[in-house]
């Protein structure tokens, strides 16, 4: 963004700065915000990209004492003779207009979301390419953010491969099941995933108040019959539920549900949480689905008259997930790694037969969306700027 200032002046009793840009646009900036974001070395630690100015020292009613400008900068003197300079590009990017704010939020958080159903074309990349090439790693994470799932092929059929992916993004998310965990048939299993039975659509770990955002599953060994993976775009199904039955959507997006997980693995644990199954932001958009029927608690903290309507709403939601129109079924091969948005996708598994030896083995891990988004922003900068 290359911007040129045509005119800048203090207005509204010097409580605002107005800029007229060469492209014909206009911007207003509050004086208190400008003073708060002074970029001088006394107010801003450039080595940490962090504000040094203490809020206690900020006059929230401050006025601009003097203002000059050229095409590339604005120069402000404040009542206590403090001096600030602001670059045109920096100011234009932070314009308070609705359009400019939406554009910047889009750059920061990459909200684009591509809904899908059974017609999904599963994004696929090579495992080694993602590890060794920034362009491929950027495609991986940007597709993960937009579509919600990416398959990587060509990993070795041994444990430890997803640890490499963890290092590629930064680090993995430690839970009570360890840094990584083995999905295979186990005697006295401490999780229903460690059996051969069918797993219905679920998100992982709603028993935590902050469930892991991204899941990684690496296929090391696959059974000949059964064990197919099933996924569904939870955001898409939520939208369809809202269209079909607004009351059911309202119940699931307003009722807190108890989840629990108790056992011993990485250490002993006793976890309790409360979530709305459909979690909305302040604009009413779905931002997370929290649902695991296995760990939904027997405790249900609602008045008795709300119990049956809740079950009816939940049953309709689950029936929609299982309809052929929305679910996508595939079978992982040894060396495949699927990485997916655990806040958006629900996943399941078809049953398979137990044998005398382990016939199906996946290694799993989690990552936090903050870590993934951090790496995605860094990769975008490298790929788009060529450095």
Swiss-Prot record:
Keyword flag Iron: yes
Binding site residues for Fe cation: 202, 204, 347
E.C. number: 1.14.11.1
Keyword Iron: yes
Manner of cofactor binding, per the entry note: Binds 1 Fe(2+) ion per subunit.
GO biological process, any: carnitine biosynthetic process
Compartments reported by the entry: Cytoplasm
UniProt keyword annotations, A-Z: Carnitine biosynthesis, Cytoplasm, Dioxygenase, Iron, Metal-binding, Oxidoreductase, Phosphoprotein, Zinc
Top-rank lineage group of the source organism: Eukaryota
Pathway, per record: Amine and polyamine biosynthesis; carnitine biosynthesis
GO molecular function: gamma-butyrobetaine dioxygenase activity; identical protein binding; iron ion binding; zinc ion binding
PTM-bearing positions, type Phosphoserine: 351
Catalytic activity: 4-(trimethylamino)butanoate + 2-oxoglutarate + O2 = carnitine + succinate + CO2
Regions crossing the membrane: none
Matches recorded under Gene3D superfamilies: 3.30.2020.30, Clavaminate synthase-like (3.60.130.10)
GO cellular component, one term: mitochondrion
Positions that bind Zn(2+): 38, 40, 43, 82
Needed co-factor(s): Fe(2+); L-ascorbate
InterPro entries (UniProt xref): AlphaKG_dependent_hydroxylases (IPR050411), GBBH-like (IPR012775), GBBH-like_N (IPR010376), GBBH-like_N_sf (IPR038492), TauD-like_sf (IPR042098), TauD/TfdA-like (IPR003819)
Protein role: Catalyzes the formation of L-carnitine from gamma-butyrobetaine.
Family: Belongs to the gamma-BBH/TMLD family.
NCBIfam families xref list: carnitine_bodg
Name of the molecule in the record: Gamma-butyrobetaine dioxygenase
């Amino acid at each position: 963004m290359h911007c040129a200032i045509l005119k800048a002046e203090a207005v509204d009793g010097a409580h605002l700065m107005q800029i007229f840009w060469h492209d014909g646009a206009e911007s207003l900036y509050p004086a208190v915000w400008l003073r708060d974001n002074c970029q001088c070395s006394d107010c801003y630690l450039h080595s940490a990209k962090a504000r040094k100015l203490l809020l206690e020292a900020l006059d929230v009613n401050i006025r601009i004492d003097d203002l000059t400008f050229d095409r590339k900068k604005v120069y402000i003197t404040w009542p206590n003779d403090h001096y600030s300079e602001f670059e045109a590009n920096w100011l234009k990017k932070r314009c308070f207009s609705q359009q400019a704010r939406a554009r910047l939020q889009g750059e920061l958080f990459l909200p684009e979301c591509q809904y899908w159903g059974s017609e999904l074309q599963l994004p696929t990349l090579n495992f080694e390419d993602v590890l060794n090439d920034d362009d491929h790693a950027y495609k991986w994470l940007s597709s993960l953010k937009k579509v919600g799932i990416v398959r990587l092929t060509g990993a070795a059929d041994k444990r430890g491969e997803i640890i490499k992916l963890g290092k590629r993004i930064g680090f993995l998310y430690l839970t009570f099941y360890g840094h990584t965990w083995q999905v295979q048939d186990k005697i006295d299993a401490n999780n229903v995933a460690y059996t051969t039975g069918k797993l219905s659509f679920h998100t992982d770990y709603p028993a935590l108040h902050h469930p892991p955002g991204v899941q990684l599953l690496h296929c090391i060994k696959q059974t000949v019959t059964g064990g197919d993976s099933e996924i569904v775009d939870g955001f898409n199904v939520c939208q369809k539920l809202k269209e079909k039955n607004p009351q059911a959507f309202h119940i699931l997006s307003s009722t807190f549900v108890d989840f629990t997980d108790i056992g011993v693995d990485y250490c002993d644990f006793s976890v309790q949480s409360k979530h709305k199954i459909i979690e909305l932001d302040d604009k009413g958009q779905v931002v997370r689905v929290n649902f695991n029927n296995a760990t939904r608690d027997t405790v249900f903290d609602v008045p008795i008259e709300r119990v049956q309507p809740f079950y009816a709403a939940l049953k309709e939601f689950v029936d929609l997930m299982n309809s052929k129109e929305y679910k996508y079924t595939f079978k992982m091969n040894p060396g495949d790694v699927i990485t997916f948005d655990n806040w958006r996708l629900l996943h399941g598994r078809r049953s398979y037969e137990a044998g005398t030896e382990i016939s199906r083995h996946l290694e799993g891990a989690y990552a936090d969306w903050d870590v993934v988004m951090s790496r995605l922003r860094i990769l975008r900068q490298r790929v788009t700027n060529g450095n």
